[in-house]
């Protein structure tokens, strides 16, 4: 199951999922923030909707949960509330920021304009807010920007990335979680705090890589890495993993 990044739809995980779909049933959910005509109520409600969908599909076990960027915040809420057995978890550049309420309120209009501009410019402004502007990812930003409303984004930020201690996780679950960061991405600054909160987790660093770079630039390689984790509880020998 995939939890997507900010400013994109769930379809943004399709390039990776297509290399997994012959082996796994892949679920690519989209937050109500980016769904036309839907209202974001709360993080708890997002989790409720995910749980309801999984139940309706008869899902009794999740082999792997993959969460990218701010998707890590929602995935963590899911992990701490679900009763479903979970095999492994992979956080790609998880945005484990702890931001004060006032700052998040100030951020909302700027983020709204940034995401909407991607729709208005047909992806032309992507390089201004992300390290790359690959044509392969622009459609997901454009689709999200088209459906985004300021109210939904403001509501999401009201209960996401909160300035609170990280939720506790059982040691056994921590041992099944991979918290990956690129060494040159801005989110790398959260790594130490996450390591202190979850000392039993795995913390691979992709040397010289930016935010979600491996996933974006090499979805097949990224999918093969996820398969290695799910089937062998270990990272493959990638040349860019920090020794």
What are these regions (language model features)?
Residues 101-102, 118-171:
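Conserved alpha/beta-hydrolase catalytic His-Asp/Glu region
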Residues 1-36:
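Conserved HGGG/HGGXW glycine-rich cap/lid loop of the alpha/beta-hydrolase fold
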Residues 28-64:
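Active-site loop/oxyanion-hole signature of alpha/beta-hydrolase fold enzymes
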Residues 66-75:
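Gly/Ala-rich beta-loop-alpha elbow adjacent to hydrolase catalytic centers
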Residues 80-117:
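Flexible "cap/lid" loop of the alpha/beta hydrolase fold
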Residues 158-196, 214-215:
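Conserved serine/cysteine hydrolase catalytic core
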Residues 209-222:
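Catalytic histidine-centered segment of alpha/beta-hydrolase-like enzymes
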Residues 198-212:
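Catalytic histidine neighborhood in serine/cysteine hydrolases
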